[in-house]
Amino acid sequence: MMQKKKLQPPLLVTIAALVLCLPLLLTGCGNSKNAPVPSVVILPEIDTELTEATPVPPMPQPLTWGASLLWNADLLMALGQCNRDKASVREQEIRRKEIYERRPEPGGGAAAR
């Protein structure tokens, strides 16, 4: 017959410590919650020259038929500049949407689809 080997006391203490501590280590993080990380959104700046006020040509004094004709031409040029500025803002908005539509969703939203 084979004799059972007796474990030495330091080995028994080590095994007992492992048996007592391992369940605590395995269940210690079971109730922890992951805090959501806020996403940082940096919006692109719109050019300041596009948001500046368009100068309005002053009304000539005295307002004659000839001066009125020149003033209307100046007003139409100012209106044209406003329309070009608005078109540039629309182009920048389209570019911004294209950039931010390509970004991954925060929190791994692509995996949930």
Curated annotation (Swiss-Prot):
It is a lipid-anchor. A lipid is attached at C29 (N-palmitoyl cysteine). GO terms for cellular component: host cell plasma membrane; membrane. Residues 91-105 have a biased composition (Basic and acidic residues). It holds the Pfam family LysC. The keyword Lipoprotein applies. One of its GO terms (biological process) is viral release from host cell by cytolysis. The keyword Glycoprotein does not apply. Residues 1-28 form the signal peptide. Residues 91-113 are annotated as: Disordered. A lipid is attached at C29 (S-diacylglycerol cysteine). It is found in: Host cell outer membrane. Keywords: Cytolysis, Host cell lysis by virus, Host cell outer membrane, Host membrane, Lipoprotein, Membrane, Palmitate, Signal, Viral release from host cell. It comes from the Viruses. Component of the spanin complex that disrupts the host outer membrane and participates in cell lysis during virus exit. The spanin complex conducts the final step in host lysis by disrupting the outer membrane after holin and endolysin action have permeabilized the inner membrane and degraded the host peptidoglycans. Host outer membrane disruption is possibly due to local fusion between the inner and outer membrane performed by the spanin complex. Interacts with the spanin inner membrane subunit. Part of the spanin complex which spans the entire periplasmic space. The spanin complex is composed of spanin inner membrane subunit and spanin outer membrane subunit. This is Spanin, outer lipoprotein subunit.
